[in-house]
Amino acid sequence: TVCIFCNSIDSIDSFYRLIPELSNACTFCSEDGQYKLWKGNRRKKSMMITKLERYNFFTSRFYSAVDIISPNPPHVIFISDLFGATQSVIDPATEAIQIIGRFRGGVNSVTHIASIRPDLECMSSTEIDDWIRGASTVYNNWKSQLTRTSNIGERTLLQEAIGENSYLPYLDDKGKPDPFLIANFYEKEQVKRLYTSTDLLCDAYRQTDYFVFSHEERLMPVSDNERMAIQHRLAKKKRAELIVRKLEEMEKM
C-alpha cells in the first residue's frame, strides 16, 4: 500500500495524465477536487476515507485529525511541487509528523520528494511585521474615511476596498486582527523559506528528532521551469524544439 500526500489536485491530476496505466488508485480530496478529477476522468475519488487502494492520494484536509486504517503499514510519500503548486509545502515539524500519526498501525517508510526553489518569494518576520502594520493603517483609514463622507462615489469605492482586500484573511468576523490567523501567516512564510534551500529543509527534518533522516539530491535533465514551459506556456513549435533539445542533451549524458 502506498499513500501519497500532496496538497495540489493539479499535481495529482498530472500523475494520472503522465502515468495513464496507473491502476488501483484513489484520490481522497474535497468536493471541488473531485469535480476537477471527474472532468478529466481521473480514476476513483472520495471525500471520505474508506477502503484503501494500492495507491492512495490525499490532499491537506486529511493531513490531521482523521485516522487512516491500513491493512498493513504503508509506504508514505510526501510531494512538494514548488514550481507548480507552492501550497504543497509540508512543515517537517508539524504536518509531516501529524500525517504519520494518522496511521495507528505504523508505517513502512516515509519519503519526501520536494523541489527546491531558491527564488521562491517568502517574507521574513520583520517584513511581515511591516506588512501588517501598513495594511492595518490603510484599512483603518478607509473605515474612518467612510464614517466621515456622505459622497456616494467615495462611499462606494471605500466600501469596495474594505469589503475585498488582502488584509481581510487576517481579521476575525468583527473586523479585528485575529492573533491565530496572523500567527499562521508567520508560520506559512517560515515553512515556505525552508524550500529555498536543501540545507534548510534537511536541517528542519533533523531538528524534529522524529525521523531517521537521510537525504539524496538529484539534478534532473529537465528542470522544473522547463517542464512547466513544455506543459503550459510554450507554443507548439517552441515546445517541440525544447523537447528535441532536451532529448539530445540526455543522449550525451
Predicted regions and their residues:
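Conserved helicase ATPase core of P-loop NTP-dependent helicases/translocases
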Residues: D32-T59
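SF2 helicase motor core recognition
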Residues: R54-V76, A96-G106
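Flexible, charged surface loops at secondary-structure boundaries
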Residues: T1, P20-L22, K44-E53, I68-N72, ...
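Conserved strand-helix element at the start of the C-terminal RecA-like helicase core
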Residues: T1-P20
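The feature captures the C-terminal accessory region of ATP-dependent helicases
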Residues: D130-M253
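Short His-Asn-centered micro-motif
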Residues: F5-S8, F57-S60, I79, I113-I116
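Conserved SF2 helicase motif VI
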Residues: F83-V110
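Short acidic, S/G/P-rich loop/turn micro-motifs used as interaction or catalytic elements
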Residues: I9-I12, D32-Y35, F62-V66, D81-V89, ...
